[in-house]
């Protein structure tokens, strides 16, 4: 198959591929820049590299250049500690890291994009492409890679089953795992998203989620497959994002629930040109859904994983109005089922589809990942008679107290409705009698007593579900995409 960027450069070359508000690159420009850089990257003779990058045009060029040079990219979360980065990269045998941000990491060859010399004018485009932006390329270092060197030859096609990217699970429930994502996985995910969410060549997608996460990278893949424009943003600022929505004809945006909340607080009280607000990464509260729908905001709740190359369940505004707790229905190209449902229909969510990874790169000895072709997500879910899917909790988060299954989300939902509580999370606390009992961590600026909380929660929850321990904290641990890191709260 032809590289998607190469195909867009041929068929959709003058369309804007990427803009940061200051610079804009057409698909022709993007392909030319990526091709020139790819020749430089091939000189490093690496089949797999780490990427330590920001949300920028240069980072996007680097990603495509790696693919054109047949290099697998391992995405590095820039919020990790040096030790965490080292452990991740060593686990998958990465020796070299390309970066668009300053990085010092012992034991690796670190190469800044600014230090990579560009090839010049000997790239062949067969007359298909032209430099419509008038970009000037520096040809003074032409001898760095000989023109006829094998490393100077770029492929314009690829194998769908080759690994495109490697990401590590967010580590919200334990040790991180290396997830290989093939071009086929990404393509199937994009097609499923188009069917369930909807986008076309006229889409203008504002992307502020980190590229090093699947939620950010998947937008770039959808764009290059379909040929639409991405408005890339490096950092989330509610005031600035709202201004972009108002003034830049933004049709699509990917957010986590908290960032949507900040935007509504900032004044996002009408859709403007927005056609789709794609939400994911954390649970969406009923109150937020109600507020967003009152503003006629086109919110689409979703559920996906690193292992599934982003979303595979999507809930439309109509679905959310009918059932606020749903994450919707599966994309047409995937199959989902519930394993071993209990009397309430709750069981482990299983998925099968071309978007699902084939198995972890690290650790390689994990068992129970797949069963009869279905990937075990590890989530407790339900599929109702209309086909709506509800996600309740990670199986690892389930609290088993005296033989009773307790879903933390149910307790958290009730606790967050208590006046003065800003945020709350419930985890299992070791107990000599019951094995585990619920413990509630909460954030509040008010003085709330344990007795007050017990009295309130007892009105809404069965006695065995009422937390036995409470702890007020300043903040709760979240990842950069808004996922709660419960494992950091598991302590005696």
Curated annotation (Swiss-Prot):
Keywords from the UniProt entry: ATP-binding, Ligase, Menaquinone biosynthesis, Nucleotide-binding
Keyword check for Glycoprotein: no
An annotated Gene Ontology molecular function: o-succinylbenzoate-CoA ligase activity
Pfam families for this protein: AMP-binding (PF00501), AMP-binding_C (PF13193)
Domain of life of the native organism: Bacteria
GO biological process, one term: menaquinone biosynthetic process
Coiled-coil stretches noted in the UniProt entry, renumbered to this chain: none
Reactions it catalyzes: 2-succinylbenzoate + ATP + CoA = 2-succinylbenzoyl-CoA + AMP + diphosphate
SUPFAM superfamilies noted in UniProt: Acetyl-CoA synthetase-like
Pathway it works in: Quinol/quinone metabolism; 1,4-dihydroxy-2-naphthoate biosynthesis; 1,4-dihydroxy-2-naphthoate from chorismate: step 5/7; Quinol/quinone metabolism; menaquinone biosynthesis
EC number(s) per entry: 6.2.1.26
UniProt entry tagged with the keyword ATP-binding: yes
NCBIfam families found in the cross-reference section: menE
UniProt family annotation: Belongs to the ATP-dependent AMP-binding enzyme family. MenE subfamily.
Annotated function: Converts 2-succinylbenzoate (OSB) to 2-succinylbenzoyl-CoA (OSB-CoA).
Protein name stated in the entry: 2-succinylbenzoate--CoA ligase
Gene expressing this chain: menE
């Amino acid at each position: 198959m032809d590289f998607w960027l190469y195909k867009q450069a041929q068929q959709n070359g003058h369309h804007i591929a990427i803009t940061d508000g200051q610079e804009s690159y057409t698909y022709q420009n993007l392909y030319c820049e990526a091709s020139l850089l790819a020749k430089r990257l091939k000189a490093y003779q690496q089949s797999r590299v780490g990427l330590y990058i920001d949300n920028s045009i240069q980072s996007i060029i680097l990603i495509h250049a790696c693919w054109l040079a047949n290099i697998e990219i391992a995405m590095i979360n820039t919020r990790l500690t040096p030790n965490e980065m080292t452990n991740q990269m060593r686990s998958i045998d990465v020796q070299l890291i390309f970066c668009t941000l300053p990085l010092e990491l012992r034991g690796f060859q670190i190469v800044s994009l600014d230090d990579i010399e560009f090839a010049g004018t000997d790239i062949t485009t067969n007359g298909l492409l032209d430099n419509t932006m008038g970009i000037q390329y520096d040809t003074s270092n032409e001898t760095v890679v000989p023109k006829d060197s094998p490393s100077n030859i770029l492929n314009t096609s690829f194998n769908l089953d080759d690994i495109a990217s490697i990401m590590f699970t967010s580590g919200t429930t334990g040790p991180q795992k290396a997830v290989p994502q093939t071009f086929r996985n990404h393509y199937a995910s994009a097609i499923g998203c188009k069917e369930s969410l909807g986008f076309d060549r006229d889409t203008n997608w504002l992307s502020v989620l980190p590229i090093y996460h699947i939620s950010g990278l998947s937008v770039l893949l959808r764009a290059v497959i379909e040929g639409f424009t991405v408005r890339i943003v490096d950092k989330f600022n509610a005031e600035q994002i709202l201004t972009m929505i108002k003034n830049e004809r933004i049709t699509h945006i990917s957010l986590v629930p908290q960032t949507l909340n900040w935007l509504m607080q900032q004044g996002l009280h009408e859709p403007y040109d927005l056609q789709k607000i794609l939400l994911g990464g954390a649970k969406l509260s009923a109150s937020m859904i109600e507020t967003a729908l009152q503003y006629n905001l086109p919110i689409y709740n979703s559920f996906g994983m690193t292992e599934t190359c982003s979303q595979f369940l999507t809930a439309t505004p109509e679905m959310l109005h009918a059932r606020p707790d749903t994450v919707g229905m599966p994309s047409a190209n995937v199959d989902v089922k519930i394993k071993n449902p209990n009397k309430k229909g709750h069981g482990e969510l299983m998925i099968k589809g071309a978007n699902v990874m084939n198995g972890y790169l690290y650790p390689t000895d994990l068992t129970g990942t797949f069963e009869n072709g279905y990937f075990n997500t590890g989530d407790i879910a339900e599929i109702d008679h209309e086909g709506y899917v509800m996600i309740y909790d990670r199986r690892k988060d389930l609290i088993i107290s005296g033989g009773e299954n307790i879903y933390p989300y149910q307790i958290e939902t009730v606790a967050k409705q208590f006046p003065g509580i800003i945020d709350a999370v419930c985890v299992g606390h070791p107990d000599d009698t019951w094995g585990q009992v619920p413990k509630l961590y909460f954030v509040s600026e008010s003085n709330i007593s344990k007795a007050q909380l017990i009295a309130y929660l007892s009105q809404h929850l069965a006695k065995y579900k009422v937390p036995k321990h409470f702890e007020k904290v300043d903040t709760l641990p979240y990842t950069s995409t808004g996922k709660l890191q419960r494992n950091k709260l598991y302590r005696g």
